[in-house]
């Protein structure tokens, strides 16, 4: 069925036939060179030209040279005619064929181990041999489709993390990627971070998505905050569609207000809206307090609405993603940033987003926000001379994150900003369930390397068969006559058939995979298993030392107010009746003792995070700082946690110096 296998044989047969035709033509010339007569016809022989050759006569004659010219010219004409006819017939029904290893190696997709810089998708030979590995070549984005236990983790994800020369942001659903590859990444020079907000032992680094907005000029904060709100707050259910815009506006106003107060965290926004009392009174109070015109406008508009409408807005806001910050662990894990997105292209960084399968749906808003914010920051400016590293977004089981509109758009543009996507799903129907047909086609058309392992659904095998295409073959049919016993007719015709039928895709064995590469024929390769491959196993076993685990995150009293958890406080808020606006707690006053305690420890703590350029710490700012410290603290006995607390304090002081006093209600 593979036409590429018979091409050399057909070419050899064509050459032999053309030479034979040329030799016969030369024999005709030798026989009839004196004219056509009966005697010449009686003595004709196909070997007549042989008797005129120097091999037979011992010397060359003019007849030999003329005959030789006839052989060459006739052979060329016959050979070209055969090739033209063959190609015309071959292209009539399709030209599908399997790619050869040589042509893919020449195109740069098959590389030796010591030349691998990109992801690894497969291998040309078994695990014990020194074969070539399939990488992405010139294609920036890739798609891996494989069901459960098909080998996508051991064959693509882990080998890629062991060998990729660049920064990686990996969605680690089971936490095994961090355990299996983090030491290799660290040994390769990466700065390794583990972001696991719901880790049972609270071992997680922190990331605050609002700090990037707080560091921007005031005129850009509103636009970036709206983008943040669009990425985080999503409508849950049909009834929420009419209130989603208002809920996002509330979130925008809350972020801008918390930046003014010196508490640039989403947890502070949750606390702001979880205060007891009538919402219209709260919004009216915030409109008077805020100095940001956009925040004032939003709060004024909200304060003029009916209580039921305000309840709908806040309900959609909470259900859309903000209620996640009722969890003290999430609030603490997003109170500061241990890594900077701006360093991803500047130095090799590996960020593992670890979450258990049971918690993935819960923290999906936070993970979705992180991915989309990183994409947005990378596309703000083209890479500089010192930003030479590519950034790989490794999205395993990314369908659980929901619809990623920013990534759906960025897949067509982010390659110019050194961004690379690797999407991993179990079947193409997973894309159909989240994105419409246009969105699914957008992913399929922009992923230049598509790897398929044995699938059991109906959509994926059909797509593979159609994408590979048809080939042309010679079909022979024989018909017999009923009137005459031995009378039959044989017909040979060109017909087309799929190079790989859908049922053959389903029967693909466990050791092979099919790869579709844009602009090249399909490729059939062996799967890679890092634990048995002679090169990858050596790299994996060379990992030594302890895992680069972060210190346990300690929760302070700021997370529990008056012995009541904030998640419970949210429930109490709904049960509150009418409340006086004066009863709204001033978070800034509540934070004053914490600020004083932190100031006492400041001189003994080293400096951690870089303060944005142009922001200088001063004693006057410390004295006038009236902003609220986020509800996150540390144990005084643990030095790493104390350093993190000092980092947060420096950020707050720098932000307050830039934007002025946090509020007219600050405690003096």
UniProtKB/Swiss-Prot annotation:
GO terms for cellular component: plasma membrane; type IV secretion system complex
An annotated GO BP: protein secretion by the type IV secretion system
Record carries keyword Cell membrane: yes
Gene3D superfamilies, A to Z: P-loop containing nucleotide triphosphate hydrolases
Matching Pfam families: T4SS-DNA_transf (PF02534)
Localization of this protein: Cell membrane
Region (Disordered) residue spans: 577-612
CDD domains (UniProt xref): TrwB_TraG_TraD_VirD4 (cd01127)
Alphabetized UniProt keyword annotations: Cell membrane, Conjugation, Crown gall tumor, Membrane, Plasmid, Transmembrane, Transmembrane helix
Record membrane topology: Multi-pass membrane protein
Stored InterPro entries: P-loop_NTPase, T4SS-coupling_protein, TraG/VirD4
Transmembrane segments: 12-32, 67-87, 153-173
NCBIfam families in alphabetical order: PRK13850.1
Family: Belongs to the VirD4/TraG family.
Name the record gives this protein: Protein VirD4
Organism taxonomic ancestry: Bacteria, Pseudomonadati, Pseudomonadota, Alphaproteobacteria, Hyphomicrobiales
């Amino acid at each position: 069925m593979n036409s590429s296998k018979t091409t050399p044989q057909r070419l050899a047969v064509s050459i032999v036939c053309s030479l034979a035709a040329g030799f016969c033509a030369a024999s005709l010339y030798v026989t009839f060179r004196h004219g056509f007569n009966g005697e010449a016809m009686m003595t004709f022989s196909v070997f007549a030209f042989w008797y005129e050759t120097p091999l037979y006569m011992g010397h060359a004659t003019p007849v030999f040279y003329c005959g030789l010219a006839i052989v060459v010219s006739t052979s060329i004409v016959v050979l070209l005619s055969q090739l033209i006819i063959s190609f015309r017939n071959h292209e009539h029904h399709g030209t599908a064929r399997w790619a050869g290893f040589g042509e893919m190696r020449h195109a740069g997709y098959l590389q030796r181990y010591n030349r691998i810089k990109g992801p690894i998708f497969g291998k040309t030979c078994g695990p014990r041999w020194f074969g070539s590995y399939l990488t992405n070549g010139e294609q920036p984005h890739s798609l891996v489709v494989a069901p459960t236990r098909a080998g996508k983790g051991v064959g693509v994800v882990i080998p890629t993390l062991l060998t990729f020369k660049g920064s990686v942001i990996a969605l680690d659903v089971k936490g095994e990627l961090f355990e299996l590859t983090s030491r290799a990444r660290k040994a390769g020079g990466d700065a390794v971070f583990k972001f696991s907000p719901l880790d049972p032992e609270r071992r997680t680094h922190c990331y605050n998505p609002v700090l990037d907005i707080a560091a921007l000029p005031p005129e850009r904060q509103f636009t970036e905050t709206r983008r943040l709100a669009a990425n985080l707050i999503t409508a849950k259910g049909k009834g929420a569609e009419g209130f989603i815009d208002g809920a996002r506006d509330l979130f925008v106003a809350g972020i801008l207000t918390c930046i003014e107060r010196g508490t640039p965290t989403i947890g502070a926004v949750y606390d702001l809206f979880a205060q007891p009392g009538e919402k219209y009174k709260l919004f009216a109070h915030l409109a008077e307090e805020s100095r940001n015109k956009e925040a004032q406008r939003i709060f004024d508009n909200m304060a003029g609405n009916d209580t039921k409408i305000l309840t709908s807005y806040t309900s959609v806001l909470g259900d859309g993603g903000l209620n996640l910050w009722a969890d003290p662990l999430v609030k603490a894990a997003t109170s500061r940033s241990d890594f900077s997105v701006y360093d991803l292209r500047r130095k090799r960084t590996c960020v593992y987003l670890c979450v258990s399968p049971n918690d993935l749906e819960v923290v999906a808003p936070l993970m979705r926000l992180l991915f989309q914010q990183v994409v947005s920051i990378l596309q703000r400016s083209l890479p500089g001379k010192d930003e030479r590293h590519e950034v790989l977004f490794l999205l395993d089981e990314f369908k659980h994150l929901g619809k990623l509109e920013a990534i759906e758009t960025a897949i067509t543009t982010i390659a110019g900003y050194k961004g690379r996507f690797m999407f991993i799903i179990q079947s193409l129907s997973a894309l159909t369930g989240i994105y419409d047909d246009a969105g699914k086609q957008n992913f399929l058309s922009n992923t230049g390397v598509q790897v398929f392992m044995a699938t059991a659904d109906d959509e994926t095998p059909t797509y593979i068969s159609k994408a590979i295409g048809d080939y042309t073959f010679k079909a022979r049919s024989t018909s017999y006559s009923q009137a005459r016993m031995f009378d039959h007719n044989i017909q040979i015709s060109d017909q087309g058939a799929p190079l790989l039928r859908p049922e053959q895709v389903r029967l693909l064995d466990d050791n092979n995979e099919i790869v579709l590469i844009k602009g090249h024929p399909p490729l059939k390769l062996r799967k890679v298993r890092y634990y048995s491959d002679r090169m990858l196993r050596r790299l994996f076993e060379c990992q030594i030392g302890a895992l680069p685990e972060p210190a346990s995150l300690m929760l302070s009293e700021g997370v529990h107010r008056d012995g009541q958890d904030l998640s419970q406080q949210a429930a109490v808020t709904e049960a509150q009746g009418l409340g006086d606006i004066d009863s709204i707690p001033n978070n800034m006053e509540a934070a004053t003792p914490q600020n004083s305690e932190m100031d006492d420890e400041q001189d003994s703590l080293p400096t951690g995070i870089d303060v944005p350029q142009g922001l200088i710490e001063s004693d006057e700012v410390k004295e006038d700082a009236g902003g609220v410290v986020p509800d996150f603290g540390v144990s005084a006995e643990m030095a790493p946690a104390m350093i993190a607390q000092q980092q947060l304090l420096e950020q707050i002081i720098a932000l307050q110096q830039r934007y002025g006093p946090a509020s007219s209600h600050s405690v003096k």
